[in-house]
């Protein structure tokens, strides 16, 4: 669920970490099969398509790693019964999560349907989300300077926001390279 106002339990986070591991394994298999496929292409095509293929794989791997880096510290925090996120953090991150999920679904549909005519809109959306996430980080840093709340909780929160920002950025790059792979 994208509602961070409800308490996240350790088993939910463990489930996410297990799913991340499954995605990592799947991506490694896809990369191996793709590597074999690239070797069967004509040299010039193999060079060009191979580059985009490997870049796409790298961006997909980075997305998976960012989700893991977002989840692991959160799980440790929950497992150690540290203070939960405060109401402002929960509300702000919950709103951003909804927007990011919508964005990710839009990007996935674009790649799955191989329809990139709205690519510019997706790029504009990624910049907007990145700017909003940067604003969340700045707001949190101001709260830390004002010494309101737990620094440990703030560090977990800042990590969550940073990794969410990475997911947005890597996804935009994945869509761009996917278009190049398909169209060029």
Give the ranges of each region predicted by the language model.
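Cytosolic, long alpha-helical scaffolding segments
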Residues: 2-184
């Amino acid at each position: 669920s994208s509602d961070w106002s409800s308490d996240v339990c350790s088993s939910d986070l463990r489930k996410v970490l297990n799913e991340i591991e499954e995605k990592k394994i799947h991506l490694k298999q896809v990369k191996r099969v793709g590597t074999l496929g690239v070797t069967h292409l004509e040299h010039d095509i193999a060079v060009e398509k191979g580059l985009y293929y490997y870049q796409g794989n790298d961006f997909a791997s980075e997305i998976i790693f960012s989700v893991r880096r977002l989840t692991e510290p959160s799980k440790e925090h929950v497992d150690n019964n540290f203070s939960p996120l405060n109401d402002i953090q929960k509300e702000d991150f919950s709103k951003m999560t909804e927007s990011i999920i919508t964005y990710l679904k839009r990007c996935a549909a674009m790649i799955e349907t191989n329809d990139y005519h709205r690519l510019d809109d997706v790029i504009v959306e990624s910049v907007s989300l990145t700017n909003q996430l940067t604003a969340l980080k700045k707001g949190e840093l101001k709260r830390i300077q004002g010494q309101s709340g737990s620094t440990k909780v703030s560090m977990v929160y800042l990590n969550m926001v940073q990794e969410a920002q990475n997911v947005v950025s890597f996804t935009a790059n994945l869509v761009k390279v996917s278009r190049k792979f398909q169209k060029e």
